[in-house]
């Protein structure tokens, strides 16, 4: 097989065993840098798949949705499923021999963990964010990282609408009071949202969906984005963040975690907001300066806030997790009036998690079986058409290498004994990725080609799919 750490076998024996039926568990295998695709007579396209897919080991952490587990098991992979995240020390041991890992937001794939990942070729983040992964080092190791940028957009947008109504009516405080036995029926400081202005910072997949929902509720929508983006409905793009803060009754953040967005809402920005306005953050925990938020709440500058994400978050559920030892300002924040706090539940709906499971597991499968890197967040995006039934003696070369001059010439010289049916190469920073389909392949020529590719000084990772 092509996966590092797989069992070695005789290439010719493995090729001779190709048939329309799945191989039995005692079949010989290709060398540990080769994969064999099954053939299906009812389909014109040939799907590249491991000859012995049960040798591909996948680790799923953090209770990834069952849709992903089912998809990956249907491919014949060996899948280990855990409901919790793992500490760095535990993961350093657990990740050895693993070819693909699936995580959510709690597991940290640090440089130390990735250095221990001796067989890893791909990472699936079953969420939007990827800041829990050392993306640059993963790319240096030839490890592609995929996420789910679209599947939970509706769930987050709906939650924000709920926040807007709850903040305007002080629902959070009234609920807490009644839980304590206190009856406090008041209208002071409670508002309808119709006719108010929602300011959206970041008009991407979530921000634009929120825009549509908000207008349906009677809100006026303005937005700020670093890129010019065509509005949906009657929304209006503003030219600066201060202008948005000055005009909006509700400010909702939908930006990624980056050095540019760290503490982008701090004391200066709170001072620019309207008196009695509201802040909502369901994006990333580093975006809002929480001590500045506490000050703005206590001073009455803002009338309330809803926070779903935090700079530091617990690794798992349970009591006494959201405490000052996690974030020094926790106690102050929890005592502020009309502050809704939720435990990072923006994408936590059955629909979102199901769709995320499907989206990411399919991306993992495409990369493992075909080398398709479209949608990777840290990696050159390359895809070739599927091989057909007519391509009986074709192989697919997947070559990750350093982005230096002369590599394509060196690789194409190694293809001298083969016909190049199709080829595509792309680069991203210091990493480049070449995918080529070659014909006139024999077991011996593939073995020799693999050895030559591995010997190139620019090589990061080599796989051959057959």
Swiss-Prot record:
Boundaries of every ACT domain copy: 396-466
Metabolic or biological pathway, per its Swiss-Prot or TrEMBL entry: Amino-acid biosynthesis; L-serine biosynthesis; L-serine from 3-phospho-D-glycerate: step 1/3
Name of the protein this chain belongs to: Putative D-3-phosphoglycerate dehydrogenase
Residues forming the catalytic site: 284, 313, 344 (proton donor)
Lineage of origin: Eukaryota, Fungi, Dikarya, Ascomycota, Taphrinomycotina
Record key words, sorted: Amino-acid biosynthesis, NAD, Oxidoreductase, Phosphoprotein, Serine biosynthesis
Chain intervals for the UniProt region annotation (Disordered): 1-26
Pfam families: 2-Hacid_dh, 2-Hacid_dh_C
NCBIfam families: PRK11790.1
Compositional bias of kind Basic and acidic residues: 1-15
UniProt-listed GO biological process terms: L-serine biosynthetic process
EC number(s) recorded for this UniProt protein: 1.1.1.95, 1.1.1.399
Cellular component terms per the entry's GO annotation: cytosol
Reaction it catalyzes: (2R)-3-phosphoglycerate + NAD(+) = 3-phosphooxypyruvate + NADH + H(+); (R)-2-hydroxyglutarate + NAD(+) = 2-oxoglutarate + NADH + H(+)
GO molecular function terms noted in the UniProt entry: NAD binding; phosphoglycerate dehydrogenase activity
Coiled-coil portions: none
Modified residues (Phosphoserine): 87, 258
Biological role stated in the UniProt entry: Catalyzes the reversible oxidation of 3-phospho-D-glycerate to 3-phosphonooxypyruvate, the first step of the phosphorylated L-serine biosynthesis pathway. Also catalyzes the reversible oxidation of 2-hydroxyglutarate to 2-oxoglutarate.
Source organism of this protein record: Schizosaccharomyces pombe (strain 972 / ATCC 24843) (Fission yeast)
Family affiliation: Belongs to the D-isomer specific 2-hydroxyacid dehydrogenase family.
Compositionally biased tracts (Polar residues): 16-26
Residues annotated as binding NAD(+): 205-206, 225, 282-284, 308, 344-347
Enzyme class: oxidoreductase
Recorded superkingdom: Eukaryota
TM region(s), chain numbering: none
